[in-house]
């Protein structure tokens, strides 16, 4: 008799738990389906533009300039410090550039682009040190 009582109690608790779970998850699923909207990350959106293919002078951090000879670290620091730019050629108007530095910049203008400043990419100190190390 005790064994039957235990089995009945176990069945009761399992049944109540299942009913509670079914009732609890149904409103959650309905709420999720009704409020579904496509969320777009502004940084991912920016990567779909020329930003993902070239160095964006207004949004890229210093580390991106490593791939081009002569730009990192001195010119990269000057470029980031004097941003934002209206056009790629504005980078040649940075005060204090030597003729050699201007020549290096001219040789690399094809690798640059300029887009609107995106706060998610430039706020804080991330343009100088994004915390990614090899």
UniProtKB/Swiss-Prot annotation:
Stated name of the protein: Photosystem II extrinsic protein U
Major subcellular location class: membrane
GO biological process: photosynthesis; photosystem II stabilization
Signal peptide: 1-30
Biological function: One of the extrinsic, lumenal subunits of photosystem II (PSII). PSII is a light-driven water plastoquinone oxidoreductase, using light energy to abstract electrons from H(2)O, generating a proton gradient subsequently used for ATP formation. The extrinsic proteins stabilize the structure of photosystem II oxygen-evolving complex (OEC), the ion environment of oxygen evolution and protect the OEC against heat-induced inactivation.
Protein topology in the membrane: Peripheral membrane protein
Cofactor note: PSII binds multiple chlorophylls, carotenoids and specific lipids.
Keywords noted in UniProt: Electron transport, Membrane, Photosynthesis, Photosystem II, Signal, Thylakoid, Transport
Family: Belongs to the PsbU family.
GO CC aspect terms: extrinsic component of membrane; photosystem II oxygen evolving complex; plasma membrane-derived thylakoid membrane
Species per Swiss-Prot/TrEMBL record: Thermosynechococcus vestitus (strain NIES-2133 / IAM M-273 / BP-1)
Subcellular location: Cellular thylakoid membrane
Highest taxon in the source lineage: Bacteria
Assembly notes: PSII is composed of 1 copy each of membrane proteins PsbA, PsbB, PsbC, PsbD, PsbE, PsbF, PsbH, PsbI, PsbJ, PsbK, PsbL, PsbM, PsbT, PsbX, PsbY, PsbZ, Psb30/Ycf12, peripheral proteins PsbO, CyanoQ (PsbQ), PsbU, PsbV and a large number of cofactors. It forms dimeric complexes.
């Amino acid at each position: 008799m005790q064994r039957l009582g235990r089995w009945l109690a176990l069945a009761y608790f399992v049944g109540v738990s299942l009913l509670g779970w079914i009732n609890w998850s149904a409103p959650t699923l309905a709420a999720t389906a009704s409020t579904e909207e496509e969320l777009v990350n502004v940084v991912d959106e920016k990567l779909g533009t020329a930003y993902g293919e070239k160095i964006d002078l207004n949004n890229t951090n210093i580390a991106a300039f490593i791939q081009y000879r002569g730009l990192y670290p001195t010119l990269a620091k000057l470029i980031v410090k004097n941003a934002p730019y209206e056009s790629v050629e504005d980078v040649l108007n940075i005060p204090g550039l030597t003729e050699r530095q201007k020549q290096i910049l001219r040789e690399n203008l094809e690798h640059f682009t300029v887009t609107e400043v995106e706060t998610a990419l430039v706020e804080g100190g991330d343009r100088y040190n994004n915390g990614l190390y090899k």
